[in-house]
Amino acid sequence: MEVQLQELVDKIKKDGVAAADEKAAEIIRAAEEKAKNIIEKAEAEAQESVKKAEAEALRFQKAAESSIDQAGRNTLISFRQGLLNELNAIIKAETAKNYDSAVLKNLIPEAVKGWVKTGNTENLSVILADKDLKELESSLSAALKDHIAKGMELKADSKIAGGFRIGTKDGSAYYDFSAEAVADLFSSYLSPKTAEILKNAAKEL
């Protein structure tokens, strides 16, 4: 009887230990699986974070490069425009300076003669700057007295800095020899040339 009881006790212990071992193994397996999932998830999140960080860094780099390129273009455009403005100002100043009274005194009568060959004198008007008309009115009136007698008029325009305009009294047809118009003509040629020079220079930077 004692032997059977001992065997029963031993069996219970054995079964209990086996069950405990199996349970422990199950717990360990579950823990390992959970740990594996956590690690995989953490690694995936880490990789995603790295990708996002790299993409953001690349975006910032491209944005910075684009900003630098744009700043360079803006600087070149600003420099070119500033240079053209300076050159235009010089051209206009020099053109106005060279339209002195001696030049106008000879040029205006020749322009009137040329106009009269293609049209009448009655409707003709010669417009000068205020200062030039005051200085030249006497000599021009003498040189053009026949045309003035037929209706041609000499008058001043405060908008003209130098030179003159010749045309019909109503302004429907005219030739503009004002300092500004002549300067603009030179500038229209100069601007593309200057732009081309600056463009070629920029390629070498």
From Swiss-Prot:
Report disulfide bridges, numbered on this chain: none
An example of a GO molecular function for this protein is: proton-transporting ATPase activity, rotational mechanism
The cross-references to InterPro entries, in alphabetical order and at most eight, read:
ATPase_E_C (IPR038495), ATPase_V1_Esu (IPR002842)
Provide a GO biological process annotation.
Answer: proton motive force-driven plasma membrane ATP synthesis
Write out the entry's keywords from A to Z: ATP synthesis, Hydrogen ion transport, Ion transport, Transport
Q: Which GO terms describe its cellular component?
A: proton-transporting two-sector ATPase complex, catalytic domain
Q: Name the HAMAP family for this protein.
A: ATP_synth_E_arch (MF_00311)
What is the recorded function of this protein according to its Swiss-Prot or TrEMBL entry? Answer: Produces ATP from ADP in the presence of a proton gradient across the membrane.
Give the family from UniProt.
Answer: Belongs to the V-ATPase E subunit family.
Protein name (database record):
V-type ATP synthase subunit E
Gene designation:
atpE
